Amino acid sequence: VLIGLGLSGGSFMVVLAAFTRLVPEDRRSWSLGLATAAGSMGQFLFAPLGQGFISAYGPVTALVLMGGMVALVPILALALTGKGDVSDEPEIPVREAIRGALTHPSYLLLTAGFFVCGFHIAFITTHLPPYLTDLGFSGGLAASAIALIGLFNVIGAYTAGVLGGHQSRKYLLSGIYFSRAVAFSLFIILPTTPFLVILFSIMIGLLWLSTVPLTSGLVALMFGTRNVGMLFGFVFLSHQIGAF
């Protein structure tokens, strides 16, 4: 429970909402992609680091060391500027903002899409490694598949943010979901080989969290930045329910 509460307090909905309010519109999509890629890089680096701590010092000491690193975050946060300037946007009551979002067809479709995104991510993370071992592949290949997803996720998230600043975000998002469907279909239809596993991991990695900067950017585009944290929070809630 405590880990879940902590993760929610430092999750994408909080970080990306801050970026959305602080960064000008012409650089917003790029900044959202950068923030998402940075979070993905942290996941990619800290997973083996944590395992190294466990192997070297044991689980209790490893937990203390990792917790100490997390404890530095609030100290570093003191240097941040705080809330962004949204004085040029009208003040909208929370209830009215929620009502407007829940009656906005595009927002509802965006939320539904993110629900499916959460299901994709949780399904692959949970079932891909045991599926590969059940087929007789080594645990090393299964671990490499997850590592490749994490590595190429950094590239995909940043690229999506950059493209979102120059192309239509809704079409980019549609293309990502369609590409996922193609990747899943090919992985199911074709004979499973180590080469296919690696290729699938790279493709899924590029598409993994590339939806995040585009989705948060679309929420800001629809409703402005004043309530973007709350409204993207509802979308992200749908994502987590899909993952559950």
Predicted regions and their residues:
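Intracellular juxtamembrane helix-capping segments at the cytosolic ends
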Residues: 9-23, 210-223
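Glycine-rich segments within core transmembrane alpha-helices of 12-TM secondary carriers
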Residues: 27-47, 236-244
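Helix-loop-helix hairpin linking two adjacent transmembrane segments in secondary transporters
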Residues: 35-82
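A late C-terminal transmembrane helix in Major Facilitator Superfamily
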Residues: 43, 209, 222-244
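Juxtamembrane intracellular "pre-TM" segments in multi-pass secondary transporters
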Residues: 86-109
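Extracytoplasmic gate region of multi-pass secondary transporters
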Residues: 104-160
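C-terminal transmembrane helical hairpin of 12-TM major facilitator-type secondary transporters
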Residues: 149-152, 166-218
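Helix-to-loop junctions at the C-terminal end of transmembrane segments
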Residues: 157-169
